[in-house]
Amino acid sequence: MGPPEKESKAILKARGLEEEQKSERKMTSPENDSKSIQKDQGPEQEQTSESTMGPPEKESKAILKARGLEEEQKSERKMTSPENDSKSIQKDQGPEQEQTSESTMGPPEKDSKAILKARGLEEEQKSESTMSPSENVSRAILKDSGSEEVEQASERKMTSPENDSKSIQKDQGPEQEQTSETLQSKEEDEVTEADKDNGGDLQDYKAHVIAKFDTSVDLHYDSPEMKLLSDAFKPYQKTFQPHTIILHGRPGVGKSALARSIVLGWAQGKLFQKMSFVIFFSVREIKWTEKSSLAQLIAKECPDSWDLVTKIMSQPERLLFVIDGLDDMDSVLQHDDMTLSRDWKDEQPIYILMYSLLRKALLPQSFLIITTRNTGLEKLKSMVVSPLYILVEGLSASRRSQLVLENISNESDRIQVFHSLIENHQLFDQCQAPSVCSLVCEALQLQKKLGKRCTLPCQTLTGLYATLVFHQLTLKRPSQSALSQEEQITLVGLCMMAAEGVWTMRSVFYDDDLKNYSLKESEILALFHMNILLQVGHNSEQCYVFSHLSLQDFFAALYYVLEGLEEWNQHFCFIENQRSIMEVKRTDDTRLLGMKRFLFGLMNKDILKTLEVLFEYPVIPTVEQKLQHWVSLIAQQVNGTSPMDTLDAFYCLFESQDEEFVGGALKRFQEVWLLINQKMDLKVSSYCLKHCQNLKAIRVDIRDLLSVDNTLELCPVVTVQETQCKPLLMEWWGNFCSVLGSLRNLKELDLGDSILSQRAMKILCLELRNQSCRIQKLTFKSAEVVSGLKHLWKLLFSNQNLKYLNLGNTPMKDDDMKLACEALKHPKCSVETLRLDSCELTIIGYEMISTLLISTTRLKCLSLAKNRVGVKSMISLGNALSSSMCLLQKLILDNCGLTPASCHLLVSALFSNQNLTHLCLSNNSLGTEGVQQLCQFLRNPECALQRLILNHCNIVDDAYGFLAMRLANNTKLTHLSLTMNPVGDGAMKLLCEALKEPTCYLQELELVDCQLTQNCCEDLACMITTTKHLKSLDLGNNALGDKGVITLCEGLKQSSSSLRRLGLGACKLTSNCCEALSLAISCNPHLNSLNLVKNDFSTSGMLKLCSAFQCPVSNLGIIGLWKQEYYARVRRQLEEVEFVKPHVVIDGDWYASDEDDRNWWKN
C-alpha cells in the first residue's frame, strides 16, 4: 500500500490566448490563427501538484506543454453552448524505469517517468478593432474542449469558441512524422481478426456509446491533445508501458468531459483503435456499496448482449476502463480492511471491484484512464500501478478575464474589476473552472445592479457567493424579505447535506439523501433562481451534485453558522451526525480547506445581518469564538507552527473582511513567521498584520516575487492604454512595509533569505525611516539586497530606534564598507550591534572597521565570524582594540582562520582593553599555545572578560591545566564554553578541582561532545555540591551512561547543590537510571531546566520521570523532551504535567530558550 519511490507523471498543458468573434453589434471579427507545435523528448522535470486552496507538495512530474491560440464566436443573442477549447498536450516519458509485471499486486518500486515536451511558436492575428497585444505565455495549461456535466448544466453565459486550425509536428527521434490520417489508418490496419469476429454486437455497443455521449460531447478528434492521448499507452524505449493514466485537476475544469470524449472517440473510430472495448464508469452514477460482479457492471453498459461481455473478458489486454470521478469514492477506498477481487465473475461491493482494478489484481492486463481532483491525488498514489499523471487545467488567464469583463461596458469599471480580480490570485485561480467563472460573472453583475444597496464584501469568494445566493433568495419577493418556515427548512436541510458530504468526501447525493434532510428537488428549484443542485446521471435513479464543489463548501460552512440559532434549533436536529467545528482547524486535511475559509468569510457582520433578515432572528454564531480560539492557538505555539500555518490563518481571516473579528483573533500574536510567494500573500498579510497590535517580532521570507512583475501579462484583456495598467506589486509591497513601520510594539524585523530588488529596498527603507517605526533589530542574513544597500545606509542615521543590524552572508565590497562605516559614524546613528558574518571582507575593509571602532562610542558588539582575519588585518583590529577610544564590549571572531600568531596579536591588544567583556574564538585552531596566551590575558587584573567561547578550538593536553589555574583565581569570568574539544575525564578532574575553589566565580560551563565518560561523574557530583556559583552545566552528547548519571544524581540530591540548569541530552541513558533521576528531581528545589532529549527511555522509565515532574518540590520549568517520540500513554502523562503545572514547557528544542543571554555570540 506504500507509494512508489518514483512515479511517472506527465502533465498535459496548453495555454491559449482567445479572441472573440462578435456579432455585428460588436463590429469585430478576428481571423483564424494557425499554429505549429513541436514535440520533443526532454529530461525529467519536477512539477508541483495542484491542490484546492492549499499549498502543494513538490513532485517529480513530466511536463507536457503546448501553446495554442483560441477564438470565440458569439451569436447576436449571446446564446450559450459548451465550450470547445483547442488543447495541446505533451507527454513526457523518462527512461531508466523498470516495468512491474502485470500481475503485480502493489505499485512498482520505480515508476518510469515519460517526458514529451511540446513547444510552439504562437502568432495572433488581431482584428482591426482589437488593439491589445498578445499574451506572453510563460507556462502551459491543458484546457478541455468541453466542460464537465455540471458545467454544461450551470453555464449560461459561457460562449463557444471556434476551433483553431493547428498543425503539429512530432519529433520522436528516428521515427517518421505521420499525419493524423496516417496514424488512424495504421491503427485500423492493426485491428485483429478477433475484433472482426465480434461482429454486430461490437457495432451495436459502439452505436450505444455514440447515442449516449454524442449529444453531450463536442470535440475534434484530430486535435493535439487527442493525438497525444492516443500514444499515451505506447511503450517508451521498450522499457516502460503505462497501464494507468490519471487525469487530475481542479474541480470543474473539464476532466469528465475529456473522459467522455475519449470513450466517444473510440466508438467513432478516432481514438484508441487498438482497444477492442472501452468501458465507461461514472462513479457518481454508481452506488458503490452495492454488490455486483465486474461482468454485471459491464453488462449494464452493454445492453442485451451478455455474449459480448464474455468476448470482452477474453481479451483483457485490449480492454480499456475509463473511470470518471474516482475521488467521489475516497471515503470507502481508505478502509484498512480492503480486500482484493481477482475473479470478474465474483460478486463484491463495487468499491472493492474498483480498488482491485486499480491494484491490478483484477484483469491485470487491462488499461485504465482515471479522472480525479487534485485533492485526491495523494491517496491515489499508493493504489495505482504503472501510472502516468496528466494535469488538466481549465480556462486560460486571458479567457477568464474576458469572460468576467465582457458584460462590463464602462471602461473605469472594467479597470477596477480587472485589478481586483488579478489581486486575488486564489479567486482568479478558482475561475479556471467555467462554472465558477460563470458564478463570479453573475455575482459581479448583481453587485453592479444593486449598487449601494449591496453591502456585502466583493473582494472574496465568500462575499461573491453570499451576494449571489442570498439575493437570489430575497429577489423572489420584493415585498417579503424573510423566508417562510418551509423555505427555512429547505435551506437548512441543504446546508446539512452539504456539510455531511464534505466530511464524508461525498459530492454525489441520491433521492434517499434528499429525504434524510427533508429536501425536495422542486422546493430547492423554487427557493433559488439559480441552479444550486443539479441532476446528473443516465441511470434510472437520479443523483444530484452542487453546481460546483465550492458551492457545496459554501453551504456546508453556512450550516455551522445556522446551528447557532437557538430559535431554529427547536425545529431541526443539529449536530446529530456532524463533526465538531474544531476539527476544521486541521490544515493538513485538504477536504476541509474550502469549507474552512468560507466559514471564516461568513463571520462578516454584513453577511450575518443579511442572514438575520432572512430568518427574522438575531444571528450570533457560537462558532465565532471557536474560530478565534483556533487562530490564537497558533500564537501560543510559535516554535511548533510553520509559516504556512500562519499564512493559512491569515487567508481565513482575510476572507471575513471584518476588522473586529480579525482583531479579536490576532490580539495574542507576539511573533510571526511569514513565507511570501504570491502577490496576494502581501495583501492578505498587510490586512492581518495591522491588527496584530501586540506583535513584537516578525520574520518575512520573500523570494523572487519582488524581482519580476507579471501583472502586465493580463493587461491586454482591458482595452486601455498600457500606461494606465499600473503594476500594483510595488504598491502592495509598500503597503506591507507601511504596516510594519506602524506597529507600535514591533521591535524585530527579520528578512533573512529574502530577495529584494533595489526598488523594493528603497520602499522598505523609506517606510522604516518613518518616525512611527519602533523597530530596533533589523536582520538581512543571507538575503540578496546588495543592489539596494545604498538605501539601507540612509536608514541607519534616519531611524534612531535602530540598535541592531545583521548583514550576514552579504558580500561587502570596499565601496559598500566605506558607505556603511560613514553611516555608522553619523552622529544620529544609534546602531550598537553589527554582524558582518561571511561578508568577504578585505584588508581595506578591516582598516575601515578599525577606524570605525575608535570613531564611534555607540558600537558595543561586532561580529566578523567566517571572515578570514590574517596577520595584517589583525594588526589593524589590534590597534583599534588597544585604543582607549574603543568602547567595544563584545567581539566575535568565530571561524576566522586565527593562528597562534594572530592570537598573540589579539591578546597583546586586549591587555590594554578594559571594556571587552565577551569574546568568542570558536572554530579556530588555537592549540595549546593560543590557549596559554589567552590565560595570560585572563591573569591580568584589568581583564574585564566575563564570557569566553572556545568551542572546537583543538584544545588538548596541557592547555586545560592552564585554564584550570586561571579559573581557580578569576572572579570576573562567569561563562566558559569548551564544547567539541577533547576534554576527556583527566582534564575534567582538573577543571572540577578549580571550580571547587571559592575564588572561582564561574556560573556556566558548556561541555557538549567533550569525550567524557562515567568515570568523571564522581568528580562532577562532588563539584556541584561544593561550588556555590555554578548554575548551569551542559554535558550533552557525552557517553555518561546510566551509571554515570546515577552517580551524578547523588550530587543533585544534596541540599548544597545550587545547580539550576543541567543538560543530559544524547548521553546514552536508558530506563535503568530513571529511578535515581526521578528521586533527584523530586528532592531538588533548585533545578529548573533539564534536557533529556535523544536518550532511550522506555514507557516505564518515562512514567517514573513524569511522576517526578509533577512532584510539588520540583521546580522544573523547562524540560527537553520530544513528546512525539513516545507512546500515547506517555504523551498523555506529559500533557498532564503541563496541565497540573501551567508554567512548565516540554519541548525538544531545549537550546531555543535563551535565558541570561546564553547564546549572545549566535544572535
From Swiss-Prot:
Induction: (Microbial infection) Reduced by T.gondii in the testes and uterus. Residues 1-42, 56-94, 108-127, 153-173 have a biased composition (Basic and acidic residues). Changing residue 1079 to W: Does not affect interaction with TLE6. One of its GO terms (molecular function) is ATP binding. One of its GO terms (biological process) is establishment of spindle localization. GO terms for cellular component: apical cortex; cell cortex; cortical granule; cytoplasm; cytoplasmic lattice; cytosol; Golgi apparatus; mitochondrion. Residues 1-201 are annotated as: Disordered. It comes from the Eukaryota. Changing residue 59 to D: In strain: 129/Sv and CBA/J. Changing residue 425 to C: Impaired formation of the subcortical maternal complex (SCMC). Changing residue 910 to P: Decreased interaction with TLE6. Residues 243-565 form the NACHT domain. This is NACHT, LRR and PYD domains-containing protein 5. The lineage of its organism: Eukaryota, Metazoa, Chordata, Craniata, Vertebrata. The gene is Nlrp5.
